[in-house]
């Protein structure tokens, strides 16, 4: 638990309620709750929704770090087109149908994403 809180940057907030945290910290808290049981798959529905650009980037860097550190596979559902540049496999869905399905050969680190 301590390692997870440290990884997520929540150590100093360990005794706070989520309502006492900023939007980005609340998002990290939600990620911590999802990771506490060491899942092999993490489903992320709009992980950057309602966050400003800097906090969005911080959350994506965090997800990238979790993937590398714990080997957690992630399925990210988003309307944020920039995120497709950091992922391995991209599926684009329109009107309930997959319109594109490809492997991203030119992945960009989350820290280098533009237009978040």
Give residue spans per PLM region.
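Helix N-cap at the start of a conserved alpha-helix in ABC-type nucleotide-binding domains
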Residues: 53-55
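ABC nucleotide-binding domain "signature" region
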Residues: 1-8
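Hydrophobic anchor residue at the start of the ABC signature
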Residues: 31
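Catalytic Walker B motif of ABC-type/P-loop ATPase nucleotide-binding domains
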Residues: 42-45
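Conserved catalytic loops of ABC-family nucleotide-binding domains
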Residues: 65-76, 84
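Conserved ABC ATPase signature
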Residues: 17-21, 25-27
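A short, proline-enriched helix->beta-strand linker immediately N-terminal to the Walker B motif
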Residues: 36-40
């Amino acid at each position: 638990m301590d390692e997870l809180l440290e990884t997520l940057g929540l150590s100093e907030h360990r005794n706070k309620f989520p309502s006492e945290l900023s939007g980005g910290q609340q998002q990290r808290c939600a990620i911590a709750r999802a990771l506490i049981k060491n899942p092999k798959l993490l489903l992320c529905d709009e992980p950057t929704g309602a966050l400003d650009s800097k906090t969005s980037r911080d959350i994506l860097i965090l997800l990238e770090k979790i993937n590398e550190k714990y080997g957690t596979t992630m399925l990210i559902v988003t309307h944020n087109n920039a995120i497709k540049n950091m992922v391995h496999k991209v599926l684009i869905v329109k009107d309930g149908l997959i319109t594109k399905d490809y492997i991203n050969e030119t992945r960009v680190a989350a820290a280098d994403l533009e237009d978040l």
